[in-house]
């Protein structure tokens, strides 16, 4: 990290106080609890770690890295292509609605921040009918000149933290369990972030059938705390 200001900006982007409603989504974890796949700290850790390794780390994280490169280069065509690709990649209606809603909230935040360095990002995303959350998030990170590997690290941490918070509520688990899970997941993030920044697009993959099934079945789950 080049400056303390960039670090502060990165912490702001990774903060659970970011007003995008991430805490209302479990991304299928709630159904995994309902079905008995997740039942305790150990099984929650396996579920989240497997998803980070086989899904988020192999597709969404590389997508963020590629989007940052496109934003930094001012490559509008590539940004729009990656945005459309990410929207099309969502495995269920709830997941697609999630990223669109969070993207909309980030677009609104862009206006509210009144930061001149974000003007180009705001102008482009306003032209899109639907914008995915990673598209806007990576645009802000690039505009704030945050290094890609640091940005992807923070993105993965924010995702993992949200998953752990969902597990704490849904299983439920205690605060100490949550901290142990975060410590274990945190130890895996540097490798995942480094891999995401170098993974060629031909090797991107979000082939996670159990995750897709969990997200789809959550849509008809009788009793729910979360929106996905």
UniProtKB/Swiss-Prot annotation:
Alphabetically ordered keywords of this record: Chaperone, Cytoplasm, Nickel insertion
InterPro entries given in the database record: UreF (IPR002639), UreF_sf (IPR038277)
Cellular localisation: Cytoplasm
MF terms in GO: nickel cation binding
Keyword check for Chaperone: yes
Gene Ontology cellular component list: cytoplasm
Main subcellular location: cytoplasm
PANTHER family per record: UREASE ACCESSORY PROTEIN F (PTHR33620:SF1)
Similarity field: Belongs to the UreF family.
Function summary: Required for maturation of urease via the functional incorporation of the urease nickel metallocenter.
Subunit structure: UreD, UreF and UreG form a complex that acts as a GTP-hydrolysis-dependent molecular chaperone, activating the urease apoprotein by helping to assemble the nickel containing metallocenter of UreC. The UreE protein probably delivers the nickel.
Protein name, entry field: Urease accessory protein UreF
Organism: Dechloromonas aromatica (strain RCB)
């Amino acid at each position: 990290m080049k400056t303390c200001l960039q670090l502060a900006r990165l912490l702001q982007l990774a903060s659970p106080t970011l007003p995008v409603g991430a805490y209302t989504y479990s991304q299928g974890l709630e159904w995994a609890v309902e079905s008995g796949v997740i039942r305790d700290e150990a099984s929650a850790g396996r579920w989240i770690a497997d998803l980070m390794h086989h899904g988020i780390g192999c597709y969404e994280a590389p997508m963020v890295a590629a989007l940052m490169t496109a934003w930094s280069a001012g490559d509008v065509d590539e940004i729009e292509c990656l945005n459309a690709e990410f929207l099309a990649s969502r495995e269920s209606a709830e997941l697609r609605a999630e990223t669109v809603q969070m993207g909309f909230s980030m677009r609104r935040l862009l206006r509210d921040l009144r930061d001149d360095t974000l003007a180009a990002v705001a102008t482009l995303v306003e032209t899109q009918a639907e914008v995915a959350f990673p598209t806007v998030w990576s645009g802000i990170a690039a505009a704030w000149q945050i290094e890609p590997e640091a940005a992807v690290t923070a993105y993965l941490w924010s995702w993992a933290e949200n998953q752990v918070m969902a597990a704490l509520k849904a299983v439920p688990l205690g605060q100490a369990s949550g901290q142990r899970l975060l410590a274990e997941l945190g130890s895996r993030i540097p490798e995942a972030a480094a891999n995401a920044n170098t993974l060629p697009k031909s090797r991107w993959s979000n082939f996670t059938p159990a995750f897709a099934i969990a997200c789809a079945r959550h849509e008809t789950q009788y009793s729910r705390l979360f929106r996905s």
